Design a protein with these regions (language model features):
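Short terminal alpha-helical segments
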Residues: 1-34, 92, 96-99
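Extended amphipathic alpha-helical scaffold segments
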Residues: 13-21, 47, 68-75
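Short acidic, glycine/proline-enriched loop segments that cap or flank alpha-helices
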Residues: 27, 31, 55-59, 82-83
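Short, solvent-exposed, charged loop/turn and helix-capping segments
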Residues: 44-63
Length: 108
């Protein structure tokens, strides 16, 4: 795990993604300048933490790159009412898997 991010930060980010997506599905409209843009900046910080993580036999460069791009894509998509629930769930599970992998790996 990156020295700049904690387990709490990863879990909080995952929860916030779900919360924002649920609100968007319920018709909430987010203001770009005051709500979406700060969250996108935060998501880029989380992606940077992933970029700082060490590689291993499972967490390869290709996986790292995909996790980082999925984080930023999902951070934007979570604010769109018409974004597919199935796709949101798959992407959320994907980054969750790698967050938990890195947390467990680096806590040993």
């Amino acid at each position: 795990m990156s020295n700049n991010c904690t387990q709490h930060m990863y879990l909080q980010f995952l929860d916030e993604l779900k919360h924002r997506y649920k609100n968007a599905k319920n018709g909430r409209t987010y203001h770009f300048d005051t709500e979406i843009q700060p969250f996108l900046i935060h998501s880029k910080m989380i992606a940077k933490c992933i970029d700082d993580c060490d590689l291993d036999s499972r967490f390869t460069y290709k996986i790292k790159d995909k996790v980082m791009s999925t984080i930023t894509e999902l951070a934007m998509s979570a604010h769109i009412e018409r974004f597919s629930n199935k796709l949101f769930t798959e992407m959320h599970k994907y980054i969750s898997h790698w967050f938990f992998y890195l947390i467990e790996r680096d806590s040993k």
